[in-house]
Design a protein with these regions (language model features):
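Long hydrophobic segments that form regular secondary structure
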Residues: 230, 237-238, 242, 308, ...
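Iron-sulfur cluster-binding cysteine motifs and their immediate structural context
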Residues: 224-248, 259-276
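A contiguous, basic/glycine-rich beta-loop/short-helix subdomain that forms a polymer-engagement track
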Residues: 271, 275-287
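Long, compositionally biased charged/polar accessory segments in the mid-to-C-terminal portions
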Residues: 309-322, 333-344, 348-350
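Ferredoxin-type iron-sulfur electron-transfer modules and their immediate structural context
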Residues: 1-232, 236, 288-305, 365-405
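Short acidic, glycine/proline-enriched helix-loop-strand junctions
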Residues: 346-375
Length: 405
């Protein structure tokens, strides 16, 4: 059987606004069980890409049948564009059970003993450590090891190779590497051990950032003030070589937060899972619609909230990558105020919102983006919007009635 491009699995809760023959294969759960290969689906039945926004939209929307049908098709196409542009190549590192633990407190010693149940542990005191090099899966630590020879304590330099590291007693810059954890970042040591355990084996990752040096204000510029991306990066996924004036990217250490994308003033850095070109193509499907901009992780938070007719969810992987360009594009496509649900936003996104709203209020006499940061705020905004729409509709009807005498 050839691959099914779009699969919709219906159940009693979401129904089936579509019928077969409209570009989407519609099956019940029993039928979907026999599907060999589907590219995009509203369920996890043997699909390459799961689109949770589809079921979410059908459960929350107040739209009539025809509008549901229209939006549903758009959601599949929007996901397809994201899939087409996203990186396909997978990289991998082998992670064995070797762990280096650095610490000297009683808590550190207790953690070392606990970790020995699961890992091949080497314990080093902070004052013994000389240097650490390498990367996740293949770190090498150099340290002084004391030993007694002929009644005298002597030090000799030793080294140990390990896949992961744990810093027990203090916060450390080392934790910017993937595979290095600080105990102080965890309230529960069991959670820490579980995280380390889950990485053992074949660890896969993909490229998360793309870069065009020709547009970079740092690359080979002797006199440059731009260091926005390296300043905001929370890991060693992006660092600068001050001697060569070049940026160095590590897909292995990158956590795909997208913060570097949001602050880049020239667009030299782009978010590989959802690049600007794809973002703009997806925005075309929102022409004239009211947009709910929301990260995929927050869909569950808004379950049970009504989504009025006319709204289309614009779902993104994460929101810190959003820049002024992204937000402005959505507003221009929609022409309505874009509703942006995000419990937390970074400083760069906040500044982009402020700049865009000031401009739109000055030129269009309306806000471009309305930020809501809680479920209660979302519901309050929707209630107010629906009331205002009803008032406007009534005023228009009254004017038409007067005009036609």
């Amino acid at each position: 059987m050839s691959q099914i491009k779009f699969l919709f699995v219906m159940d009693a809760e979401v129904g089936a606004p579509l019928e077969n023959g409209e570009g989407i294969i519609v099956l019940d759960h029993e039928g979907a069980h026999y599907v060999v290969d589907a590219l995009i689906s509203n369920e996890l039945y043997r699909s390459h890409v799961f689109a949770p926004e589809i079921n979410w939209y059908l459960k929350q929307t107040q739209a009539e049948h025809n509008e549901k049908n229209e939006i549903l098709k758009k959601l599949y196409e929007m996901r397809f564009i994201r899939y087409n542009y996203a990186p396909k190549k997978t990289h991998a590192v082998t992670v064995d059970r070797t762990v280096l633990m650095i610490g000297e407190s009683e808590e550190a010693l207790a953690l070392v003993e606990s970790a020995k149940r699961y890992f091949d542990v080497t314990h080093v005191l902070p004052q013994e450590l000389l240097s650490i090099e390498g990367k996740f899966g293949s770190f090498t630590a150099h340290f002084n090891q004391k030993s007694e020879e002929e009644g005298e304590m002597k030090e000799q330099e030793s080294e140990v190779c390990c896949s992961q590291l744990v810093v027990c007693d203090q916060l450390s810059e080392l934790s910017k590497h993937r595979g290095v954890e600080c105990v102080m970042d965890y309230s529960d040591t069991d959670a820490l051990l579980k995280r380390i355990r889950n990485r053992i084996g074949h660890y896969e990752y993909k490229k998360t950032i793309t870069y065009d040096a020709t547009h970079c204000m740092y690359h080979h510029h002797e006199k440059t003030a731009c260091s926005l991306c390296t300043d905001i990066c929370p890991t060693f996924g992006l660092v600068s070589d001050e001697t060569r004036k070049e940026l160095i990217f590590s897909a292995l250490d990158c956590i795909a937060c997208g913060k570097c994308v949001s602050v880049c003033p020239t667009g030299a850095i782009d978010f590989a899972p959802f690049p600007q070109k794809a973002f703009l193509e997806v925005a075309d499907f929102c022409q004239g619609k009211k947009i709910l901009l929301i990260a995929e992780a927050y869909l569950k938070t808004l379950e049970g909230c009504e989504l009025p007719s006319g709204y289309i969810p614009y779902v993104i992987e994460t929101d810190p990558f959003l820049s002024l360009l992204h937000l402005k594009a959505l507003f221009e496509k929609s022409t309505h105020t874009v509703l942006f649900y995000a419990p937390h936003i970074g400083e760069a996104t906040h500044e982009a919102l402020k700049t865009l709203n000031e401009e739109s209020l000055r030129t269009c006499h309306q806000k471009a983006i309305e930020l809501v940061q809680s479920k209660e705020a979302f519901e309050a905004y929707m209630t107010l919007t629906c009331k205002n729409d009803a008032v406007c509709k009534k005023e228009i009807e009254n004017r038409q009635r007067i005009q036609h005498g």
